[in-house]
Amino acid sequence: MASAMGIGRFAYTPLLPEMVAQYNWSFATAGDLASANFIGYLVGALLAPAITQSPFIRIWLAASLMASAATTYLGAEANSFNLWLAVRFLSGVASAFCLVAVTTHLMFVLAKERQERFGNVHFAGVGLGILICMLAVYGGGDVSTQWARLGALSAGLMAVAWFLIGKHQFQPIPVVSRQSIDSGFDWTLWRLIIGYGFFGFGYVVAATFVVAMAQRLDTPGVDVRSVWTVVGLAFVPSVYLWQWVANRFGLLNTLKLAYLVEAVGVVLAGISGSYAGLLLACVLLGGTFGAITALGLSAARTAAPNRVAFAVSSMTVAFSLGQLIGPAVSGRMADASGDFVMASLLAAVLLVAAAGLVRPGKAAVT
């Protein structure tokens, strides 16, 4: 997760202002490149169910990890926008494969062992990857040098990950009968899926442009990329803290609260005129978006216990649709208005709507 998601997927955020300056891009262009990555993520999510049910799931996971590291390194060699689009698209496919394969398999194994409480632990790896990514970025150099450094780090993490899990026996997720699927259906899952799509748009505006937002503030002597470090620092413990809340107040109640807290953070990021305010927004953003990812997938698994692979991949597809639209729309809104206020308000409205969709159905997840 640190390699494929923390670096492969989110390295673009701290490097975005330098890339905009070096390549003379508009925010719309930068948003389109982010969307290319998320289109790849969508394609990967659509293909992922077949992977989780394949006897070659270990090979697919290894290939995805290698592809993630390779496409990160290729950022150093990209010399045209079309090549950038291809690189970021392939990176998105690889990260989706990794997320769905690891999450689905982990949920299946933990449910079998009755250890579901550990089902969200691996999401902390995303925050760890963000922090490792920032260490590489602080090393300096031009954009190509930084992408090459990140590619090497991603490859190192990939090797460590495979050393730790490579000997583990990955079993294909069994396909359940149509009768089993139909008998477990209720609207709780579909409300979760729709809300998760809103979340994809809602979080990605700040997650893509927060460093660019910081760059617009009057912060002499401050490395504006530090805001992304704060996101990573808040991310790592957030999964555990929100799981603790969920254990006491219920999964759906906690998911609803997390959506609302993130909405506050997204609005604050867009309207804040001070560095301190933006740092607080980053704490709220980093402290929720990983946890919402984990809580949302857990809620979907609980709502559809007979079709975990379908639930996880459907949530990922909805999330992908939201996040691929978000950067393209918000980048154009920022170019038109000169700031990120309206884009952030739109994102917050969708997060509030996502919270409103979190309601128990006949298979309540409370």
Give the ranges of each region predicted by the language model:
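Extracytoplasmic gate region of multi-pass secondary transporters
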Residues: 13, 189-229, 235-237
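Helix-breaking motifs and short loop linkers at transmembrane-helix boundaries and internal kinks
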Residues: 24, 77-83, 250, 272-273
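Helix-to-loop junctions at the C-terminal end of transmembrane segments
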Residues: 44-57, 238-251, 334-335
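Helix-loop-helix hairpin linking two adjacent transmembrane segments in secondary transporters
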Residues: 81-83, 112-166
